């Protein structure tokens, strides 16, 4: 009985934790891909936006993140680069619209079409 109660408790904690993490799907108009955003602190100045291949074994495509100070971009090669010394240009009321635009810009810069 105690094991069952512990299992239920940890399941609830996990569900509540995931709900508080607040993953949001942003507009991303690329077939079979999705853009997921979540905040990680600093009054929403720490955040991660990740482009994933929907329903894929290796879903990672790109990531843009702010650590409350600098802006980082990681492409499908897995190399993380500092792309701005601060996140001010994105941490505005239009953040959810600006993030997809910036990811597309960085993808074309670091992964130009062949």
Predicted regions and their residues:
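Positively charged n-region of N-terminal signal peptides that target proteins for export
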Residues: 1-5
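Bacterial N-terminal signal peptides
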Residues: 6-15
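Secreted/processed peptides and extracellular or luminal domains of membrane proteins
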Residues: 46-48, 72-74, 93-94
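Flexible, solvent-exposed short loops/turns enriched in glycine
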Residues: 59-89
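C-terminal partner/receptor-binding element of secreted or periplasmic proteins
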Residues: 78-114
């Amino acid at each position: 009985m105690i094991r069952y109660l512990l299992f239920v408790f940890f399941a609830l904690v996990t569900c509540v934790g995931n709900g508080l993490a607040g993953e949001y799907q942003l507009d991303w108009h690329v077939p079979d891909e999705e853009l997921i955003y979540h905040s990680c602190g600093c009054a929403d100045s720490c955040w991660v936006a990740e482009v994933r291949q929907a329903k894929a074994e290796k879903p990672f495509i790109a990531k843009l993140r702010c650590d409350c100070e600098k802006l980082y971009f990681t492409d499908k090669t897995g190399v993380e680069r500092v792309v701005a010394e601060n996140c001010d240009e994105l941490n505005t009321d239009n953040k959810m619209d600006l993030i997809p635009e910036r990811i597309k810009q960085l993808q074309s810069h670091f992964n130009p079409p062949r």
